[in-house]
């Protein structure tokens, strides 16, 4: 029979299910699956760490059984069963899952191969220094405490969190209708980013990217491209493409290669990956691999793929990226609880939320310290007052009937507060000595200073920020670690296509209007010496002319430098293939991000970006810079800054330095030349400005040519009026870098100014082109070597009023007379390569 007080309320089933499911959803979102933006922890993680703190499991304490930790957590704070709590504890101890583990485990806590941890009765754990930083000052009323599930104890709503743990360790979880997947970051970089936002709340995400370029996963690996990082940081959502770290080694027989995997993408099971590769080999999806084995040990990961003889490691690596978890996608979703509401946040908003939390913690801690200091100062004031009339105080106490009567007498006769009276009654006799009185006075004075400081902190926001800044800087100094994950520019879109591109020799032509094309070498048929040749570029089309010719392979890189100091990458196979008479297409069509007024100034053909080789860049005003070639080894679609250009200056040349014997020669418009060893120019970073290469005679003078030469070569200097001179390199006295140099050719009315200079041999030909379209090709065997001080000889008879505007070197095959490649070009007083 129903109780009279019970009331039955009829309710629509559909409405009840909606309300119940909504309550369940919010419970999962807030109390289970999503981390708090302030300390980066879910409730289960927070309760485990708090239970460990209550057990006093500090980094210096002995490890305790995980069964004890899980039991206390379950019994006191998290009533979900020990078997549910233990996996959370285990994950916080795994250094391949957490960038900065919060639990120091002892025993078998699993492996990157997916092996399970030992049972909790066998394993032991304690807190790490990272978790201590999260818990620090918890006992100073810095955060709210709430009753536990059965209201027998109190637990913190959030930890004080001395560092932004959510971004340091990341988080993942699936709630109802939403999920979070936050990547981990490097603590040192994150602190630098946080300091930027702390100093200037309007800090842009671009500025954050400069100090924190992207996530840093505990397993290392490689992030391909920055587009996913930028999307994640700006919008809170993005896709990061992660790759294993791979290198290639020669097999012991030196006839085959081995592909070695030394770091896994985040959350990839190594053992499962090895099985996956083996299965694909058996299915013939992956060909060219003879054996796969896991040689990992205590020193690190090492998965070896032995290739069959003659197989290309690059092609197989690309197939691994395509078909296996050697390359995976990390779907970042920066979703966290902010003020108890789930929000998808940008990197700036997430850092700002932690700063707000930390400022609140500092204020609450300061208020706690202030109250403590004021309470103690109040007691010390009573001591000092009592010590000043100690005889009367002692007499009053002796005449009192009991402690309560003595306390009442002290309050009534001397004006002490109850707290002061109790403290006086508890004084020991030795504290009445002169030395102890001095100590009391000193302590009181120190407390007054602290109280004044605490009040300033509570009144001034900037002082709170200063405290946070000092704490972060101390953490940065002590706990900064190198990045594990490297970020490489995305060349993956090119790789898959390149595998099917034939590796063949081609001829590349660039016109004066920067039209480019490529042609197979076979279209230039071999001829005997003295043949008429074939047309490789139609010189009759408008006013355009052939500016440069290169011999290259379809899989080579072209480094394209502009007059504004930018460098762009192109693969040779990306250039349009054209017929011999075709003009080609504008090269700027293939360069993303090129700015108005930016023109091609130099082009280099590079097969490999080798260490120990350099690029030499030269500007019109005589600035030179040497950069390691491997600094350009990470292609970027929108180019990079190769040289910082001064106002009014421009890049005119880029040269490839391959050995120590090569010298640098700079030629100026007014006939001066300087020669010096390239080691006089120290290697610099890509964004550096460079150093002085030559001092110009006056404001009308400028550099027209930069050459990299050896002492056994000769150089041809050509003037506007068709005159020139070929001299030995050794005839040009070596001078210091930055000097005015020596005369290269006499500048007078007959010769005109210097058009350019090119290093040549007897087997080279020079193509000279004039403003009126006249062109002549001169064999260098017909131009004798002359002394440096001579005026030179006539190279070409120009029509009246005509002048030379361009010169080009063509290397000639002495057996066939066939033009093979062009090394250098001067056009309108700018150097092309």
Curated annotation (Swiss-Prot):
Keyword Oxidoreductase: no
CDD domains from the UniProt entry: TOP4c (cd00187)
Main location: cytoplasm
Keywords per UniProt: ATP-binding, Cytoplasm, DNA-binding, Isomerase, Nucleotide-binding, Topoisomerase
Domain Topo IIA-type catalytic: 34-500
GO CC field: chromosome; cytoplasm; DNA topoisomerase type II (double strand cut, ATP-hydrolyzing) complex
List of catalytic residues: 122
Record's keyword annotation contains Nucleotide-binding: yes
Gene3D superfamilies in UniProt: 3.30.1360.40, DNA gyrase/topoisomerase IV, subunit A, C-terminal, Topoisomerase II, domain 5, Topoisomerase, domain 3
Subcellular compartments: Cytoplasm
One GO molecular-function entry: DNA binding
Short sequence motif named GyrA-box, residue ranges: 527-533
Additional free-text comment from the UniProt record: Few gyrases are as efficient as E.coli at forming negative supercoils. Not all organisms have 2 type II topoisomerases; in organisms with a single type II topoisomerase this enzyme also has to decatenate newly replicated chromosomes.
Purpose: A type II topoisomerase that negatively supercoils closed circular double-stranded (ds) DNA in an ATP-dependent manner to modulate DNA topology and maintain chromosomes in an underwound state. Negative supercoiling favors strand separation, and DNA replication, transcription, recombination and repair, all of which involve strand separation. Also able to catalyze the interconversion of other topological isomers of dsDNA rings, including catenanes and knotted rings. Type II topoisomerases break and join 2 DNA strands simultaneously in an ATP-dependent manner.
NCBIfam families: gyrA (TIGR01063), PRK05560.1 (NF004043), PRK05561.1 (NF004044)
Entry protein name: DNA gyrase subunit A
Protein species of origin: Chlamydia muridarum (strain MoPn / Nigg)
Gene: gyrA
């Amino acid at each position: 029979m129903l109780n009279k007080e019970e009331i039955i309320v009829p309710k629509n089933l559909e409405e009840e299910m909606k309300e119940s499911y909504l309550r369940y959803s919010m419970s999962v979102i807030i109390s289970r699956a999503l981390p708090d933006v302030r300390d980066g922890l879910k409730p289960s993680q927070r309760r485990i760490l708090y239970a460990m703190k209550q057990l006093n499991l500090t980094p210096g304490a002995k490890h305790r059984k995980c069964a004890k930790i899980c039991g206390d957590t379950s019994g006191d704070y998290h009533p979900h069963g020990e078997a549910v709590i233990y996996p959370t504890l285990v994950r916080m101890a795994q250094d391949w899952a957490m960038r900065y583990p919060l639990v120091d485990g002892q025993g078998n806590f699993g492996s990157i191969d997916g092996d399970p941890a030992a049972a909790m009765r066998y394993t032991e754990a304690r807190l790490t220094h990272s978790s201590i930083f999260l818990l620090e000052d918890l006992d100073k009323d810095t955060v709210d405490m709430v009753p536990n599930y059965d209201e027998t104890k109190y637990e913190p709503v959030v930890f004080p969190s001395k560092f932004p743990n959510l971004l340091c360790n990341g988080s993942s979880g699936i709630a109802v209708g939403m999920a979070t997947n936050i990547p981990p970051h490097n603590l040192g970089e994150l602190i630098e980013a946080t300091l930027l936002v702390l100093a200037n709340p309007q800090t842009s995400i671009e500025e954050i990217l400069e100090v924190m370029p992207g996530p840093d996963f505990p397993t290392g690996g490689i992030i391909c491209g920055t587009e996913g990082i930028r999307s994640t940081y700006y919008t809170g959502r993005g896709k990061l493409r992660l790759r294993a770290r791979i290198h290639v080694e020669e097999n012991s027989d030196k006839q085959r290669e081995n592909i070695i995997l030394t770091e896994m993408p985040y959350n990839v099971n190594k053992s499962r990956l090895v099985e996956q590769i083996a299965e694909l080999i058996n299915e013939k999806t992956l060909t060219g691999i003879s054996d796969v084995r896991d040689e990992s040990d205590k020193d690190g990961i090492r998965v070896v793929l032995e290739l069959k003889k003659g197989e290309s490691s690059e092609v197989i690596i690309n197939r691994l990226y395509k078909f296996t978890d050697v390359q995976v996608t990390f779907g970042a979703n920066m979703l966290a609880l902010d003020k108890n509401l789930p929000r998808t946040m940008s990197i700036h908003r997430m850092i700002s939320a932690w700063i707000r939390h930390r400022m609140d913690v500092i204020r609450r801690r300061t208020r706690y310290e202030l109250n403590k200091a004021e309470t103690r100062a109040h007691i010390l004031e009573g001591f000092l007052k009592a010590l000043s009339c100690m005889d009367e105080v002692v007499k009053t106490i002796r005449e009192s009937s009991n402690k309560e009567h003595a306390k009442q007498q002290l309050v009534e006769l001397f004006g002490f507060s109850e707290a002061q009276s109790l403290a006086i009654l508890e004084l020991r006799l030795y504290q009445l000595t002169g030395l102890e009185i001095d100590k009391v006075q000193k302590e009181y004075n120190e407390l007054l200073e602290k109280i004044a400081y605490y009040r300033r902190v509570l009144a001034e926001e900037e002082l709170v920020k200063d405290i946070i800044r000092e704490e972060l800087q101390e953490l940065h100094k002590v706990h900064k670690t190198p990045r594990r994950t490297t970020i490489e520019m995305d060349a993956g879109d090119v790789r898959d296509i390149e595998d099917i591109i034939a590796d063949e020799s081609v001829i590349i032509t660039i016109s004066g209007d920067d039209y480019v094309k490529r042609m197979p070498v076979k279209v230039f048929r071999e001829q005997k010496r003295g043949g008429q040749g074939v047309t490789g570029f139609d010189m009759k089309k408008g006013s355009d002319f052939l500016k440069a010719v290169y011999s290259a392979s379809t899989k080579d890189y072209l480094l394209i430098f502009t007059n504004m100091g930018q460098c762009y990458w192109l693969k040779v196979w990306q250039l349009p293939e054209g017929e011999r008479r075709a003009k080609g297409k504008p090269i700027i069509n293939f360069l993303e991000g090129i700015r108005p007024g930016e023109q091609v100034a130099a082009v280099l053909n590079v097969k490999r970006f080798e260490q120990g080789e350099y690029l030499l860049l030269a500007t019109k005003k005589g600035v030179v810079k040497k950069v390691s070639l491997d600094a350009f080894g990470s292609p970027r679609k929108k180019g990079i800054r190769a040289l910082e250009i001064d106002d009014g200056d421009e890049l005119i040349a880029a040269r490839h330095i391959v050995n120590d014997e090569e010298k640098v020669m700079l030629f100026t418009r007014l006939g001066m030349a300087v020669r010096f060893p390239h080691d006089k120019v120290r290697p610099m970073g890509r964004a550096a400005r460079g150093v002085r290469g030559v001092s110009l005679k006056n404001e009308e003078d400028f550099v027209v040519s930069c050459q990299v030469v050896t002492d056994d070569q000769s150089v041809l200097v050509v003037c506007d009026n068709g005159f020139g001179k070929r001299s030995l390199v050794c005839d040009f006295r070596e001078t210091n870098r930055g000097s005015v140099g020596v005369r290269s050719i006499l500048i007078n009315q007959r010769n005109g100014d210097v058009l350019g200079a090119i290093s040549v041999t007897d087997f080279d030909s020079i193509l000279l082109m004039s403003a009126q379209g006249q062109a002549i090709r001169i064999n260098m065997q017909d131009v004798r070597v002359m002394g440096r001080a001579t005026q030179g000889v006539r190279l070409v008879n120009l029509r009246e009023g005509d002048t030379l505007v361009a010169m080009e070197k063509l290397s000639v095959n002495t057996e066939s007379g066939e033009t093979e490649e062009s090394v250098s070009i001067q056009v309108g007083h700018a150097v092309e390569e």
